[in-house]
Amino acid sequence: GLGGLMYKAINKELIDQHNQSQKSNLDFDFEYLEQKLKKSNIDIHAIKEQIKKFQVAVPTWGVGTGGTRFARFPSIGEPQNIFDKIEDCAVINDLIGFTQKVSPHFPWDNVEDFKELKEFANSYGIGFDVVNSNTFQDPSDGSASFKYGSLTNSSQEARDKAIEVNTQSIDNGKILGSKGLTVWVGDGGNFPGQMSFSKSLERYIDSMKKIYAHLPKDWTVLLEHKPYEPAFYSTVISDWGTSYICAKELGDQAMCLVDLGHHLPNTNIEMVVSRLIDVNKLGGFHFNDSKFGDDDLDAGSINPYEL
């Protein structure tokens, strides 16, 4: 851990030895596939080069133990802090080789010294991708309540605090070498008449403009939509259309993020992606899978063809 010898849950040499023992079988299968694809005029080496460029950032919360609205069950050896999470993410990269960056979440992953965190991660060969902000839980210092919304709250005081969480996340990310911020808000209502549809969206755009103004010139802000949860009657940023309207209003540095679980059942997500590409607003993905909603299952485990 921090300040001591580098810790690896699985030794890289062990992984290499195991891979070496399987190499002859892999080479045989690869050569067979190469000849098979050749008959269709497909160059396997060109595909291999494309795949080598593909990188996925592991979300730091992905190596922790999640929970449901009923309970949370801790697991053996679960990370206690961001340094523990980096160690686990490094093992994932050792195993699969294309997760050289992580995506942290603030304030969950806050530390006193972000320069120290960056150096620690780099010692494991890990860098930092897009950072994420959390305004769906109240600030730990009790300075504001997000019970009735964050960036869209009718209280200016609450909105200002939510904006501050985001600008602070940008500042943290700058030290870590990140180039982007993802904003997902749980703002919404559970009853008809609880909130104004139009005024809440106006407040969201107004708040986002202040966050957007804080972005470095080479950064991107990714707007993430979700149809429901935690609110069920209405969610302010509920679909890709709303996300697109807001991104267009903010400017060229604002893009839309597509989480594969943030859609109503039977939504054609592939077409949503195509539409956003057509209007130059597709900014990124959160890869997962679902049967009903935001199930957060392994990518491709339910809908492999869709993926």
What residue ranges belong to the model's regions?
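Well-ordered, non-membrane alpha-helical segments in soluble/globular domains
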Residues: 75-91, 112-115, 166, 198-208, ...
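Short, surface-exposed basic-aromatic patches at helix termini and helix-loop junctions that form
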Residues: 117-125, 249-250, 273-279
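Active-site acidic/histidine proton-transfer and metal-coordination neighborhood
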Residues: 34-50, 127, 133, 144-251, ...
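N-terminal pre-domain/capping segments
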Residues: 1-174
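Gly/Pro-rich active-site loop or hairpin
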Residues: 73-80, 195, 233-241, 263-307
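Active-site beta-loop-alpha junctions enriched in small/polar residues
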Residues: 61-63, 105-109, 133-136, 186-188, ...
